[in-house]
Amino acid sequence: MKTIYKSKYYKIVCVLRWLWLKIRFGSKFHCPKPSMIGKRCGIYIFKNGKIKAKARIIVNDDVMLYAKGTLQIGAQFGINQYSRIVAHEQITIGDNVTIGQFVSILDHDHQYEMNDEQLQLNGYITAPVAIGNNVWIADKCTILKGVTIGDNVVLGANTLVHKDVPSNVVIGGSPFKILKQLT
């Protein structure tokens, strides 16, 4: 028995969603090959925003992609349910990157002040995020602004990435620690 995700009808509907995004956003959504866009995805591209994919991408159900800046995605990219990528400035994702469920990748923090015992939000502080090639980001990871993740990296579940990660490592924890060197 086939699951609905493997049925040809589901694939056709996903490709129609991709086509609708190409029509809706025009040159702001560059994805050269038909891609799988799941149900209830929030894909928002604002005035100066762009989403540029190198090749076909797989975006599972209930994912949010938010581009006020540039979101660049490499080949062989997949993102799973309930994850979000929010680019106010720039997020670059390399080739062969897989993102688990409930992952957040953010290139900004909120800027705020305390005035007369009242919290006042004053925009955002941004810094680019770069994720290398051959990276697996497990469930519930959070990647914060200004981070560079090297090539051939595995992020364990629930990892908080707040500083740069070297290549060829397995990391985990909150904040993260290097758990293993990959050869």
Task: Please provide the spans of the model-predicted regions.
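Short, conserved secondary-structure segments in the cores of folded domains
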Residues: 47-49, 69, 127, 145, ...
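A short acidic, glycine-rich active-site loop
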Residues: 118-129
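Domain-scale signature associated with acetyltransferase and cell-envelope carbohydrate enzymes
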Residues: 1-106, 132-133, 141, 167, ...
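Conserved catalytic-core motifs of eukaryotic protein kinase domains, centered on the activation segment
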Residues: 109, 116-117, 181-182
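Beta-rich strand-turn-strand
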Residues: 86-87, 139-154, 159-163
